[in-house]
Amino acid sequence: MWKHIVDRQQGILNFTEELISAIGKTRVLVAGAGGNGAVLDFLLRVGYQRFTIIDFDFVEATNLNRLPFTPDYIGKVKPEAWKEYLQKVNPGSSVTAYSRKITRNDESWLEENISGVDIVALGMTDFEANFLISRVCHRLRKRMVVGPGTSNCWVVSTLTNERGVSLESVAGFGTDHIDARNVDYKALLPKYMKIYMFPGRIEKLYPETLQKVRSGDIPPRNCKIFVSMVNAASCWELVKNTAVINGIKLQNTKIIEFPLIQIFDPFKGSAYYYNAAKERIGIPNWLTGRIRWYPVTT
């Protein structure tokens, strides 16, 4: 089945036999099996077939607006639901599913599992889990792709974890030498949110809706249109990273290295970059390839 799945993409720039073969062998850990986790469907259909999935939640009826499940999946644990779905599409795929809520006490467990994969896609909504996974990836020098599924934009970035840049350093947490079990996550949350609250993001919700989401009165808002954009962005970023990991040269594209974040705003029809460390917006010139940087104005 795998050969049939990857057949139609051969001949697209960068999708060489060498890269497609590497994709089929790459081990991907997807942390979070909700809207962000729907990248699994994209990954499967470009040829990835070795997955580890972590989540603790169950499939609900409201998940069907963005996940490729049918009503008979409702009530199933999400990682197991994804395993069933992925292996229906490609029976040759290997899927390890963990129903587990990641907490500050899971660092050694995460290290064991992340050390056994090639790359990580981070898609959890819980800050404590994201902090811990980011820290372990940085320690193990594992590349990690991120893209907030509730941003209502195409948005993506890669923590390559090769040049000393980490989530903790860019956010200014000051936690580098603090045991994860002793971190005050509640106190750090505003700094974390600031990184991903790129210019233009809050404009995608009505003010009263934004207030209800922030207060916890309603879950984060999402829509298949925009979640799929983030999934596509993350999948493409994972493909590019797979090439780099395997020493395959990319043509006419490159990795979006954190603290740089790539954004396409479908409401305004404009693409730009956001440097989360310097709080600057970069406007690319399609003709010249140059980026002009501006300070963020409030």
Q: Where are each of the predicted segments found?
A:
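N-terminal charged helix/coil linker that caps or initiates catalytic domains
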Residues: 1-29, 61, 257-263, 275-276, ...
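A short helix->loop->beta-strand "cap" motif at the edges of active sites that frequently abuts
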Residues: 48-49, 93, 140-143
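A structured beta-alpha segment of the ubiquitous adenosine-cofactor-binding alpha/beta core
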Residues: 79-131
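E1/E1-like adenylate-forming module used to activate ubiquitin-like modifiers
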Residues: 116-230, 257-298
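Oxidoreductase and adenylate-handling cofactor-binding alpha/beta cores
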Residues: 230-249
